[in-house]
């Protein structure tokens, strides 16, 4: 009995210390308004650490002590995002921003106006934080938007991120999305410490933040001055959030999640432009690096009406600041050959620090761009990081041109294989005619073929492809599938286990889908979305290869240029040989599953809303099942809603559906309907 009372007393001490440390940590790291001296905070933390060391059975994942880091990891595991983490389209001037609003209004078919939620575009790393019953259970990087890395142990060390939400009334599951960044002051102090120890300094705060989040040892991450601001939500289960983007962030702030103090609700696009100008003027005085502002439609229901394109929401845009510029010398020009044979002039520059990185190369794109710039070897040029990412030559300082400046001469034969170079009428790009005979094209074509979005061959990276081509072990995509583990072991850093893993991965990749196969062929201008549209429209590879231009133009996302590229590709005998060889080595895919003509789907055209927590299905599985039955799944209840599927703890959406006399199913009713 005494032991039980003692255990209860210790648990109460731990709970009190954890609660006080969480409160004072929030006051210090988020509100910048400490209530107690640092020494008192440190004393409480030491007391907590001592108690937890004595009673490890009472350890809690949301304890403030978890911020100091744990046992180093061997590697990061992959995390599949339940909802994709999309990127944003960009605007670089007021005209492009006004065009963005016009697209919104045209799509909404309204002459009215749209209100916006605006925020600085932080130069950091996008992350997803998953809270279950108020406790942080997982943090993941954005990755490619569909799959990221599990960085939970590192994110737990970020003091401004609550390990447990404050207050009450939060959703059962809540995914918070935001930006991890390193404030300027912390970055400067980190680099000063590194230089003092003789270590290499980070180039910019973004690189420092990225390097910190990818530390396998979270104790190192815990020493880095990282911070976080939320900018949106992903998965929400168990209750409905506010119908305003801005108000949702205010809700998050009430639960202890940091919100950028510069976020504003604005009524008109002119207000947005004024906000952009104001933030731009104050950019250097802000505590963190930014490269523009993000503009989002504020009303969540309107966001859902606008929807998404392949990689970005239609309802948001990043308005970038003019890129930083510097002057440097153009020492030489080299010509690179790309996957489709495009020959690109690359300027070799005197290294210059611009926009946070050292730049020594910049693309000159093509002969038209060289002529437009009037640039010569030996010139002093102004270099800019377009969108603060891609180095670009924007002009020549002709007053500094030396007497020995040389004109840039384009090759008439390929610099790699010496095949003829041709420039098709109406195109700016010159191309090598060598095809797979050209090593450069062969390498790039094979790299594309095995890439994640194509055949997704694990263990077949760039260096492996380069060695296979350089050693003339593979000349066509089909040749990859004829490799044996014994042959592959001759490659650098390729032991028997790695070789067998590569061969097994190649064998597994033979089972693919028609959209992936079309994309893997590397047809110019045919991306993932176009490949999927072609597959869904024609259903078979034979129908695609035999299609006329008129038939191709009927396909969504296929215009004149793409149609011509498809026709030209499949008319080339050597391209059809590549396709037939791939089929011959066993590449295959399931038939496209489409409903029979004239067959009406059970929920065809019905507008369905999902709400509450589901126990038998995941939210994504339920949505996919409803869509397969013909339904249009939306996120908010309105007079247009035909059906509400309500799980446990359904909130205001259920109430609204009842008020509007909308048909309501529970989860079991949906499962039964699916199994009919």
Swiss-Prot record:
Task: Extract the Gene3D superfamilies matched here.
Answer: 5' to 3' exonuclease, C-terminal subdomain, 6.20.10.30, BRCT domain, DNA ligase/mRNA capping enzyme, Helix hairpin bin, Nucleic acid-binding proteins
Database matches in SUPFAM superfamilies: BRCT domain (SSF52113), DNA ligase/mRNA capping enzyme, catalytic domain (SSF56091), Nucleic acid-binding proteins (SSF50249), RuvA domain 2-like (SSF47781)
The Enzyme Commission number assigned here is 6.5.1.2
Mind listing the UniProt keywords for this protein, alphabetically?
DNA damage, DNA repair, DNA replication, Ligase, Magnesium, Manganese, Metal-binding, NAD, Zinc
BRCT domain location, by residue? 598-676
Q: What name does UniProt use for this protein? A: DNA ligase
- Single Gene Ontology MF annotation: metal ion binding
Catalysed reaction(s) here are: NAD(+) + (deoxyribonucleotide)n-3'-hydroxyl + 5'-phospho-(deoxyribonucleotide)m = (deoxyribonucleotide)n+m + AMP + beta-nicotinamide D-nucleotide
Residues noted as binding Zn(2+) in the record, renumbered to the chain: 414, 417, 432, 438
Point out the gene that encodes the protein: ligA
Q: Which family does it belong to?
A: Belongs to the NAD-dependent DNA ligase family. LigA subfamily.
Function text: DNA ligase that catalyzes the formation of phosphodiester linkages between 5'-phosphoryl and 3'-hydroxyl groups in double-stranded DNA using NAD as a coenzyme and as the energy source for the reaction. It is essential for DNA replication and repair of damaged DNA.
For binding NAD(+), which residues are annotated in this chain's numbering? 38-42, 87-88, 119, 142, 179, 296, 320
Q: Which domain of life is it from?
A: Bacteria
Question: Organism, per UniProt?
Answer: Photobacterium profundum (strain SS9)
Cellular component terms per the entry's GO annotation: cytosol
Zinc listed as a keyword: yes
In this protein, the active site sits at 121
Q: What are the recorded Gene Ontology BP terms?
A: DNA repair; DNA replication
Q: Which cofactor does it need?
A: Mg(2+); Mn(2+)
């Amino acid at each position: 009995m005494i032991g039980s009372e003692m255990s209860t007393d210790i648990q109460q001490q731990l709970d009190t210390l954890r609660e006080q440390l969480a409160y004072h940590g929030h006051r210090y790291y988020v509100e910048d308004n400490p209530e107690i001296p640092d020494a008192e905070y440190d004393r409480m933390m030491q007391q907590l650490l001592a108690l937890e060391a004595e009673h490890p059975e009472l350890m809690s994942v949301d304890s403030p002590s978890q911020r100091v880091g744990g046992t180093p990891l061997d590697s990061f595991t992959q995390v599949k995002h339940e909802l994709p983490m999309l990127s944003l389209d960009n605007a670089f001037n007021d005209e492009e921003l006004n065009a963005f609003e016009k697209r919104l209004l045209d799509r909404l078919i309204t002459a009215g106006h749209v209100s916006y939620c605006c925020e600085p575009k932080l130069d950091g790393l996008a992350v997803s934080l998953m809270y279950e019953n108020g406790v942080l259970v997982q943090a993941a990087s954005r990755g490619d938007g569909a799959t990221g890395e599990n960085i939970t142990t590192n994110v737990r060390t970020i003091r401004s991120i609550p390990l447990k939400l404050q207050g009450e009334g939060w959703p059962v599951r809540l995914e918070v999305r935001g930006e991890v960044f390193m404030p300027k002051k912390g970055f400067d102090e980190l680099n000063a410490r590194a230089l003092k120890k003789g270590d290499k300094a980070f180039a910019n705060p973004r690189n420092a933040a990225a390097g910190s989040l990818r530390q396998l040892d979270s104790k190192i991450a815990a020493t880095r001055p990282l911070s976080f601001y939320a900018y949106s939500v992903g998965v929400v289960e168990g209750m409905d959030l506010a119908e305003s983007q801005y108000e949702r962030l205010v809700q998050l702030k009430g639960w202890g999640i940091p919100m950028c103090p510069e976020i504003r609700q604005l009524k008109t696009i002119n207000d947005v432009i004024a906000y952009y100008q104001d933030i731009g003027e104050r950019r250097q005085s802000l505590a963190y690096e930014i490269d523009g502002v993000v503009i989002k439609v504020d009303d969540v229901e309107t966001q859902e009406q606008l929807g998404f394109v392949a990689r970005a929401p239609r309802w948001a845009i990043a308005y970038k600041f003019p890129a930083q510029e510097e002057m440097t010398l153009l020492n030489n020009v080299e010509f690179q050959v790309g996957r489709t044979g495009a020959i690109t002039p690359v300027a070799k520059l005197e290294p210059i620090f611009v926009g946070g990185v050292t730049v020594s190369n910049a693309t000159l794109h093509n002969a038209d761009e060289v002529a437009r710039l009037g640039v010569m070897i030996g010139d002093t040029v102004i270099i800019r990081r377009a969108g603060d990412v891609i180095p670009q030559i924007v002009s020549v300082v002709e007053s500094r041109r030396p007497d020995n400046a040389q004109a840039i001469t384009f090759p008439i034969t390929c610099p790699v294989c010496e095949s003829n170079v041709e420039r098709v009428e109406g195109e700016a790009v010159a191309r090598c005619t060598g095809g797979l005979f050209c090593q450069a094209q062969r390498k790039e074509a094979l790299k594309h073929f095995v890439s994640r979005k194509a055949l997704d061959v694990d263990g077949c990276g760039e260096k492996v492809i380069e060695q296979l081509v350089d050693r003339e072990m593979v000349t066509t995509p089909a040749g990859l599938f004829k490799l044996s583990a014994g042959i592959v072991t001759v490659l650098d850093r390729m032991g028997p286990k790695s070789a067998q893993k590569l061969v097994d991965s190649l064998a597994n990749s033979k089972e693919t889908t028609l959209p992936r196969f079309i994309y893997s062929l590397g047809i110019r201008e045919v991306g993932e979305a176009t490949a999927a549209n072609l597959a869904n429209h024609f259903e078979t590879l034979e129908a695609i290869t035999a299609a006329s231009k008129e038939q191709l133009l009927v396909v969504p996302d296929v215009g004149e240029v793409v149609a011509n590229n498809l026709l030209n590709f499949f008319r080339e005998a050597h391209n059809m040989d590549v396709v037939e060889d791939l089929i011959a080595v066993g590449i295959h895919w399931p038939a496209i599953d489409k409903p029979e003509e004239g067959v009406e789907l059970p929920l065809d055209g019905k507008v369905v809303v999902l709400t509450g927590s589901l126990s038998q299905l995941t939210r994504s599985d339920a949505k996919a099942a409803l869509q397969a039955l013909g339904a249009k799944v939306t996120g908010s209840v309105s007079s247009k809603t035909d059906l509400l599927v309500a799980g446990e703890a359904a909130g205001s959406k259920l109430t609204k559906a009842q008020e509007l006399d909308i048909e309501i199913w529970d989860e079991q009713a949906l499962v039964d309907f699916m199994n009919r």
